[in-house]
Amino acid sequence: MQFDVVATNPPFQDSTNKKKTQHKLWIEFTQRAFDQWLKPEGMLLQVSPNSFLSPSNKILKLMQQKDVKYLRLDTERYFPKVGSTFADYLIYNRSSDKKTEIIVNDNTFEQTLDSTIFYLPNDISKESLEIHKKTIFNITNKLNVKYDYVTCHNTLIHRNDFISRTKTENHIHPIFHTNAQVWYSRVRQDWSNKKKVMWSRSGYTKPFYDDCVYGGTDMVYYVLVADDTSGYNLANNLNTKLMKYIFKTAKWSGFGNEKLFCSLPDLPTDRAMSDSQMYELFNLTKEEEVYVENYVG
């Protein structure tokens, strides 16, 4: 049986089989609404967590494929005693190239939700989306960001003695983990001996130049550079207010995201840029510059 309308606030997770279920029930429920329950042209009216803003989220991908009439992202105001964030939305079971009405804190604007917008910034507004378009979404030349998720994965610290939180006779090779933690490894990663700009996806994103000192855990991302000058310049440019804004507003659950990092623009390494030069490089309007300045502080 299929329906013209499904109106729901689906269960968040399986409270009975928590240990057996690795997915969130509300996501599966939403997918089934379109795969099984709704007629063609039928509509889903739903309240759910707003955790679908991040890259690769299944619900955001679904929205990109359907006709989203409206998307309200401040729904938690109606649930003041619930410590979570919510959204509500109306989605038709059909494809569409029409714009979606997005509502946040009494501000309303229209935006096409297509595959070029592979995440929604956590300060979503008309201004923020324009800034992310100019800096991330519409960029073709990207930084060559690298990572190593295998050699020194942080879970190894619980499984064997391959890595250690402290330096020992066997663990002599420093590996960058988070802004506050440097661990040590029994082996030297081949890229450790190369000049690079690196950062952790945990906590604040603070790129810095490393002159062949550190390796890294699976938390770490890096960009190889030709020399010291290039390294210091790139680190400077990645720490300008515009990039700090991008890192801050494209972060979910306290962590940066691989897809964002691998979509960073190929910034100059031949010079250290000022904030105003960075704004000019990406053609930000004066209003957008003020928005970034006010947000970053």
Language model features with spans:
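Short SAM/SAH-binding signature in class I
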Residues: 2-9
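Conserved Class I SAM-dependent methyltransferase catalytic core
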Residues: 4, 14-77, 88-91, 234
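Mid-sequence acidic-hydrophobic segments that form the walls
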Residues: 9, 13, 36, 257, ...
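A short beta-strand-to-loop transition that corresponds to the Sensor-1 phosphate-sensing loop
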Residues: 9, 48-51, 202-203
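Proline-rich low-complexity regions
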Residues: 10-11, 49, 265, 281
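Glycine-rich nucleotide phosphate-binding loop and flanking beta-alpha elements
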Residues: 13-14, 52, 97, 205
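C-terminal substrate-recognition regions of SAM-dependent nucleic acid methyltransferases
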Residues: 76-291, 296
